[in-house]
Every structure is written in structure tokens, then in C-alpha cells.
């Protein structure tokens, strides 16, 4: 019985860590449902090679005019690493959303290293997708993108 309560206490401590370490600029923050759908979209995009990982790649892609969906981790330290991303996304018309954990973001993006941000694109970096694969990815992308835009307007 004692180990059960200790396990429950450790889970509660982990939940508190997310709340404490979350950056103050992490708005709009995805809720649990949106977060789950976003991570599923990232997993599909990673499998199809339609994903840019890391701040440098994401910034480079946005500046070159590539459209997509930017997902930023909210527990980045130091925060200066990602403070320019929301402004860059707004200027380029790219929807963006924050998720609480960089570790979860990396896991969804099929990498072992924690990732600050990812950009989900509809076109792969190399090669082409079949029409069926593109249609599936596009429907998921549009659904998540619409939810993020709705969330962003409710925050502002």
C-alpha cells in the first residue's frame, strides 16, 4: 500500500513540474484533445518525411515561404530560443500552437532528442506522396489547423 501512495505522489509531482516549467509566453496552449490530435498528425508527417525539426530548420523553412503548421514546446529553457517563432509565424500566416513538453514533441516526431519546435508540411522534402496518402494527411492537417486557428482567436 505504501508504494502505491508513493507512486501517486510522484505522478502528482510530475504534473506540477509541467505547470511550473511552462514558459509564460506559451499561448495558445493546446488542450489534451488537441494535443493528442496534433501529436498523431506529427507522427503521420514524420513517417511521410513532411516534417521539419528544430528551430533552425523551422525558421529557414518559414522564411523561404513554405507553409505548414508550427508546433512549439512550452517548457524550453532559456525561453529566448523560441521567443521569435510566434512573431515569425504570424507574419508568414503560419498557424502555431504550444504543447507542454519538448520530450513528448520529440517522441511524436520520431526523434530521441527533445525538440523545441516542429513544422508540419503537406509536401515532403524529397519525393512525392500518393494521392491517397496526401488526402489523408491533408484532412488531418486541416482539422488540426482549424482547431488551432479557433484556439488562437479565443485567446486573443
Swiss-Prot record:
GO terms for cellular component: nucleolus; sno(s)RNA-containing ribonucleoprotein complex. Signal peptide: none annotated. GO terms for biological process: rRNA pseudouridine synthesis. GO terms for molecular function: mRNA binding. It is found in: Nucleus, Nucleolus. The keyword Transmembrane helix does not apply. It comes from the Eukaryota. Its main location: nucleus. InterPro entries: eL8/uL1-like, H/ACA_rnp_Nhp2-like, Ribosomal_eL30-like_sf, Ribosomal_eL8/eL30/eS12/Gad45, Ribosomal_eL8/Nhp2. Component of the small nucleolar ribonucleoprotein particle containing H/ACA-type snoRNAs (H/ACA snoRNPs). Required for ribosome biogenesis. Part of a complex which catalyzes pseudouridylation of rRNA. This involves the isomerization of uridine such that the ribose is subsequently attached to C5, instead of the normal N1. Pseudouridine ('psi') residues may serve to stabilize the conformation of rRNAs. Belongs to the eukaryotic ribosomal protein eL8 family. This is H/ACA ribonucleoprotein complex subunit 2-like protein. The lineage of its organism: Eukaryota, Viridiplantae, Streptophyta, Embryophyta, Tracheophyta.
Amino acid at each position: 500500500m505504501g508504494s502505491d501512495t508513493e507512486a501517486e505522489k510522484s505522478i502528482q509531482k510530475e504534473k506540477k513540474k509541467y505547470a511550473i516549467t511552462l514558459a509564460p509566453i506559451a499561448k495558445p496552449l493546446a488542450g489534451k484533445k488537441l494535443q493528442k490530435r496534433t501529436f498523431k498528425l506529427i507522427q503521420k508527417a514524420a513517417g511521410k518525411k513532411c516534417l521539419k525539426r528544430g528551430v533552425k530548420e523551422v525558421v529557414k523553412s518559414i522564411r523561404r515561404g513554405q507553409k505548414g503548421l508550427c508546433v512549439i514546446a512550452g517548457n524550453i529553457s532559456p525561453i529566448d530560443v523560441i521567443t521569435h517563432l510566434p512573431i515569425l509565424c504570424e507574419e508568414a500566416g503560419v498557424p502555431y500552437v504550444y504543447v507542454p513538453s519538448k520530450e513528448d514533441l520529440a517522441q511524436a516526431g520520431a526523434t530521441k532528442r527533445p525538440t523545441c519546435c516542429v513544422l508540419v508540411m503537406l509536401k515532403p522534402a524529397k519525393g512525392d506522396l500518393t494521392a491517397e496518402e496526401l488526402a489523408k494527411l491533408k484532412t488531418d492537417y486541416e482539422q488540426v489547423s482549424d482547431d488551432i486557428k479557433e484556439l488562437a482567436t479565443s485567446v486573443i
